[in-house]
Amino acid sequence: MARHGDTRSPSPVGSTYSSSRRSRRDDDRYEKSRRDDLRSYRRSRSPERRYRDRDRDSYRRRDRSVDRRDDHRDEDSYRSSRRDRSRDRRRSRDRGDDRDHRRKSRERDYRSRRDDSRDRARRRTDDSADLKHKSRRDDSRTRNLDSKPREASKPSTPAPTAPTEDEKRAERLAKLEAWKQKQAAERERKQREAAAAGGARSILEEIDRKSGLSPAVGSPQSPATPTTDATPTPYSGKFDPKAIVRNAAPAPSTPAVLGNDVAVPQSAKASASSSSMNNHVQANKHPAANSTTSCKLYIPTIRFLQIANVTCTATSTVKRNVGGFGLGAKQVADAEKSSAVKTLGFGEEESKRKKLERLPTPPLEDAKDDMGAVDAAVEDEDDVDMQDGGTEEENAAAARAAAERREERLQSEALRAQSKEAALQSNGDVEMNDVPHQAESEKMEVDAAEEEVDPLDAFMSELAETAPPKKTTGARFTKAKDQQPEAMFGDEHDVDLTAVGEGDADDFLAIANKAKKKKDIPTVDHEKMEYEPFRKKFYTEPSNLAEMTDEEAASLRLELDGIKVRGVDVPKPVMKWSQCGLGVQTLDVIQKLGYENPTSIQSQAIPAIMSGRDVIGVAKTGSGKTIAFLIPMFRHIRDQRPLENMEGPIGLIMTPTRELATQIHKDCKPFLKALNLRAVCAYGGAPIKDQIAELKRGAEIVVCTPGRMIDLLAANAGRVTNLRRVTYVVLDEADRMFDMGFEPQVMKIMANIRPDRQTVLFSATFPRNMEALARKSLTKPIEIVVGGKSVVAPEITQIVEVRNEDTKFVRLLEILGNLYSDDANEDARALIFVDRQEAADTLLRELMRKGYPCMSIHGGKDQIDRDSTIEDFKAGIFPVLIATSVAARGLDVKQLKLVVNYDAPNHLEDYVHRAGRTGRAGNTGTAVTFLTEEQERYSVDIAKALRQSGQKVPEPVQKMVDSFLEKVKAGKEKASASGFGGKGLERLDQERDAARMRERRTYKTGEEGEDEEDKEDKAEKADERFSKIVSSVQSAAAAATTPLPGVPKGIDLDGKITVHRTEKDPAGASKNPLDKVGSAVADIHARLSRAGVMRSGVPIDNRGPDAGAFHATLEINDFPQKARWAVTNRTNVAKILEATGTSITTKGSFYPAGKEPGPGENPKLYILVEGETELAVTNAMRELMRLLKEGTLAAADSDARAPVGGRYNVV
């Protein structure tokens, strides 16, 4: 509560202080005998001391200035600037600290500082907020009139009169009389209307006599009558604020729209200009101490948006100021009520500018005990105009008429509620027909004007002519009626227990499972497709090569690094670019790039590819394999017609890594501009929307990774791109493409390309097991091998050292120091390979501490980081790069002179590719490998690579090789297979099968192509899997006879399930001892048969005396966590309880996927729904199934959006 004295806090509503703050001098003018003597500690100054002779002249001069401004004050609103001028000149003699307080309060208190004490006695005797407001308002106007006798004991000096005040006063009185006549006519019309409502008067009077309550409504004063001092008398009628609002407002011609402004009559505007505009009504923020303390009626006003909070206390009458339209004040007097009357709590009130609030309607059955509180809730609230509230009798008659209309409306709604079909057709809501009166009593409606039909509803009802028009214009919020869920569990109007059918649960679980599965593309039937013919053969052998004999061709291949070919009709290798049959534009680009002569692989591969043959090319790293398949592709594409709208690419290049795809795309760019071609690089990690936009614009060449290509083919139902025009396919690093998880994706893409395509495979390594797999997608291929299938280039110096783990980092620093100590290697690059992502980040941190600028790259980083890191490394921004094997293929850096295998590679091909990052295009390089004593398994492949490249194997490495081979002979170790396939396609197949079985058990995917064993297993456990998805509603008696645990019997797979009552002990049980023994034995067998098993419809503890008449169970153990949370959190359960009146209990224990409860253990987590009617249980189950569906779909969606995690930790 606000403090007394010179506090800055405003006075509370209803206090005897003015709502505006006073200066200290004004407060001192009051005598100590006034009612609010809380400031009695201040000294009082009499008028004689205040207006003594020495300052009387100045006072009169100031009054004359006030009189000169009276005309402006009457015609226009008060101007704060004018008041500030006059008030600033008048200062209190008190120079205390309240000067700031006095200055700040002047904008909020417009009472003139020149008024005398003429009305002081009147304010002292009459504590009415309305009279105090009017006396302050008319203080300055009556200052110049003849002085009146005062009730105060001390006289004051009379003020000079102004000649124009009488005329203005007469004019205002004339306007007032005209306004009164208009209001009198309005009241007579309302009385005639109220007379028609006399039928309900007797009923309501009888209710009033029974209740013994007499709430009173004060008649609002005429806002422009300053002399009215009558206190309204209470009446013995119902307090109906709706009727007050309706009577106070002008006769409505159109429905009032919430939030619009209400026009103020001209007479009200005239009086508003001279009334108090800053008499604030402070909202009472004190909460009720108990239910019998107070009730609140919030009366919002329109233009000035001040919320009046009228508080009705049980012990005293507190008077409040209600501001509205600046028309003065209104007295609201409330009669005393008994302390037993309960009040209606409306919660925390939030007052907002230019917003009207609506309050809920209390339950109707409480009307006898709480008549005043029920009527205090504003049910149908129009915009308020506080001009005239009428007399008490008129208000009472209007209240009774409104109550009669409300009674008729509720009766008609109760009749409609009895018809279930009509209710379903009109609103689609589920009616609780068992307790219609209770449902209606809990209904809370918020309408703008209940008795008036909304124009839109009326128009729609005229069109339909089947449903009666709804008499609501605002939003309706009901407790008893909950929105009917969508008809996803059977027929829309079916009310039986088909709510938990099999097919619908399978539908949304299948949707969730589909979201988790990878995108799939359909298999194309090539026999039904009509493909355009295309030409493969573009190569014409030059005459000098045609005259060459086979012996001369073999000698030439031997000179070109020992080219080995295998196949039928292999073309002879070319010696110059001009012999390849290329176009002028291509030759110009080759010349600009500085390619003088073809490399070994290029001289043999280009003629073979341009002859239209499938080719397998194996060559050492850095030998120019990329140009070997790009140049024939450009010639191949240029021979075909241009692309049309929505046609896919002609050339498709697939790579295993994103970095390699980026590098191939970069190598294409010099040729694209010259040949007027377009290429798109599509790889994972980059935004797919950009790649889709480029593909829709059209591209003859697509460089991609297999996973992203499948995504693009499946995007937008295959409308983004297609493979119908693909005739040239390249698999770069082909051994890796057919390894591990790449093989299914690659074969899926290859199956959708026309069979007569031309396929080219290139790699630096090609194990024999991968070779057999790759040949399945080729047709009579030519195999070209240059320098061995898995051989390190002879330009690379290989160093292998056997070291302990703790000495490797020191040795690495020594190698880097030796490299950069030579000025010639100032621009050299160093690439360090590790085996794990964590090791890459750890080594990065250690090298940074030692002063080496470096970066790391691995599969756990974002693609944009990987791309920028490689670009910076090539540009020389940092000289050292730490990487996993993700950078072992395709990375081409010309200044790379040192490769360090900090962690030894685990097979030969990985070692060849790592070492091949240096010594490219004829340059020299160094590859250093660290081996530890525990890595003797890897020493075999490293020694083999050294021997194949013609280098000596170090003695410590040879000892490790011999030791490992002896262990293999003794059976203690197993020799590792060559190639990346060492991790095993079989292992991945087993993991995929295991994941598929888990999904099948959990979600019942029902995938096709299952083997016989899976089919038999599915047939044996069909009922058990069905019970994991949805619960059935089944009686305890019927379920007790189930002989086999875990396999419920009597379940209709068509979804027609019946709800039975919970088993009750029969009243007239037989007293035969043998019957009792037999019943006990049967009960024991039934309990033993279901020990630890949760079957649908049979909760273990549903036999108690408090068990509902009907029940159902819903197992949620195997659903995702989000789905379980959706049906068990307090908020959702509370909503279902309020809507259906059932009891919902979470029972059982949670078991992870694949784990079943043992004997004597709790069943799996489930929900027990109990209710007194079948309809209540059904509605609760439908809502729970809906929440379960939403949670399952949300969990699947979040899993699909989750980023792929890596094997490293952010430090």
UniProtKB/Swiss-Prot annotation:
One of its GO terms (cellular component) is nucleus. Its EC number is 3.6.4.13. Signal peptide: none annotated. It is found in: Nucleus. It comes from the Eukaryota. One of its GO terms (biological process) is mRNA splicing, via spliceosome. A motif (DEAD box) lies at residues 732-735. A motif (Q motif) lies at residues 575-603. ATP binds at residues 619-626. Keywords: ATP-binding, Helicase, Hydrolase, mRNA processing, mRNA splicing, Nucleotide-binding, Nucleus. Residues 377-395 have a biased composition (Acidic residues). Residues 1-240, 344-429, 975-1023 are annotated as: Disordered. Belongs to the DEAD box helicase family. DDX46/PRP5 subfamily. The Q motif is unique to and characteristic of the DEAD box family of RNA helicases and controls ATP binding and hydrolysis. This is Pre-mRNA-processing ATP-dependent RNA helicase prp5. The lineage of its organism: Eukaryota, Fungi, Dikarya, Ascomycota, Pezizomycotina. The gene is prp5.
